[in-house]
Amino acid sequence: MKPTVALVGRPNVGKSTLFNRLTRSRDALVADQPGLTRDRHYGQGRVGEKPYLVVDTGGFEPVVDEGILFEMAKQTLQAVDEADAVVFLVDGRAGLTPQDKIIANRLRQLDRPVFLAVNKAEGMKHAIAGAEFHELALGEPLVISAAHGDGVRELMELVLEGFPDEVEEEDSRHPKFAVIGRPNVGKSTLVNAILGEERVIAFDQAGTTRDSIYIDFEREGHTYTIIDTAGVRRRAKVNEMLEKFSVIKTMKAIEDANVAVLVLDAQLDISEQDATIAGFALEAGRALVVAVNKWDNLDGEQKENVRREIARKLNFLDFAKFHYISAIEGRGVADLFKSIDEAYRAAMSKLATPKLTRVLQVALERQQPPRSGLIRPKMRYAHQGGQNPPVIVVHGNALDSIPASYTRYLEHTFRKVFKLQGTPLRVQYKSSENPFDNDEKDKPRAKPKPMSKMRGREKEVRYGKNSKK
């Protein structure tokens, strides 16, 4: 599982700048998805062979003009407590402040690594920039410039030193799904409905604040693993009014699942947080099933309004199946499993190269990719580049400027033909020269003869053999 790194510090020390630098390589994965609005306080990154999740806790801090920190928001404290490592950012130009000391006192109580990074040190000698911060007793200060990238790689290499390199994902032979969603939408009720009251009691166990609970169970002869982020409890103990939303726990659960079940509350408007959580799953490439809960509490007109709002605000989830359920009554829960199975099969599909190439050729016959300047991209063949989510690699020439709209056209075509309902689909391009191409248009043109050998013939053509100059 990817380690989670929390960025901590008082306002205006450069947390957002550092966050953007650490996550910029991942932004393009969802940037071209129409309708997706993404909260920029979480993301993914990589240093060499080590991937990581990163959370900018500054996004959860209250915005106040005075009396700042350490009355950090509850979610900031929760994120710090749940992270695998913490980067404490201070301002090398402003120097040590009372707020820095208060935050450091809290961080010294943690039982996980804390790395002190002195930011905004452009043009300063490292020894001078970090000198006064030794007082915080958090180890040797690491001097960086988030704006220019100086020292950032060295910082992250040190942070990730104790964590293993990326390993191949476990080839799960059955669906492993996470129930995700914002607070108070009925996740715990749905988990209880899925497992059954007896099953919940049998598996009732204390989980730590940092870990979700993994439960294997069988349903109609099929094996599943459910990842419960809220904690499995007896129904009498469930009090969703007290439920806290954990960004880190949700991110980790999605990363470790092969299917995510997103729970929405039909009685509430689709919120930014709903779209953000959906964005987690989309960026991670996870298969997705959406459960719209408390559906039985609405009348006909209200139901139609909810459907319209979902279509407008979550249109980037057009690949997912939507189910309208009542978790507390158990209505619609059985149908969820049909979609979970379908999404899992789609995510783990194996796609044959000959058929992929034939489908590509049909798509090209219907609609060619647009020209980029004077050059039209040429697509030759396709093969599968990965699973969970399925990745289709298209080979050809001049494929560096394919617009997002044409990529979505190909995604739609592949999805329809291969019946990839319920999973995101990635189409990637690889430009290369094809030495076996016999297309006359691609053959190099004959080189013109040297002028010295053409001089006499040129004169004959222009003047004639017996013409006078």
UniProtKB/Swiss-Prot annotation:
Residues 429-469 are annotated as: Disordered. SUPFAM superfamilies: P-loop containing nucleoside triphosphate hydrolases (SSF52540). GO terms for molecular function: ATP hydrolysis activity; GTP binding; ribosome binding. Residues 3-167, 175-348 form the EngA-type G domain. Keywords: GTP-binding, Nucleotide-binding, Repeat, Ribosome biogenesis. Residues 349-433 form the KH-like domain. GTP 2 binds at residues 181-188, 228-232, 293-296. GTP 1 binds at residues 9-16, 56-60, 119-122. InterPro entries: AAA+_ATPase (IPR003593), G_ENGA (IPR031166), GTP-bd (IPR006073), GTPase_Der (IPR016484), KH_dom-like (IPR032859), KH_dom-like_a/b (IPR015946), P-loop_NTPase (IPR027417), Small_GTP-bd (IPR005225). Pfam families: KH_dom-like, MMR_HSR1. One of its GO terms (biological process) is ribosome biogenesis. Associates with the 50S ribosomal subunit. Belongs to the TRAFAC class TrmE-Era-EngA-EngB-Septin-like GTPase superfamily. EngA (Der) GTPase family. GTPase that plays an essential role in the late steps of ribosome biogenesis. This is GTPase Der. It comes from Chromobacterium violaceum (strain ATCC 12472 / DSM 30191 / JCM 1249 / CCUG 213 / NBRC 12614 / NCIMB 9131 / NCTC 9757 / MK). The gene is der.
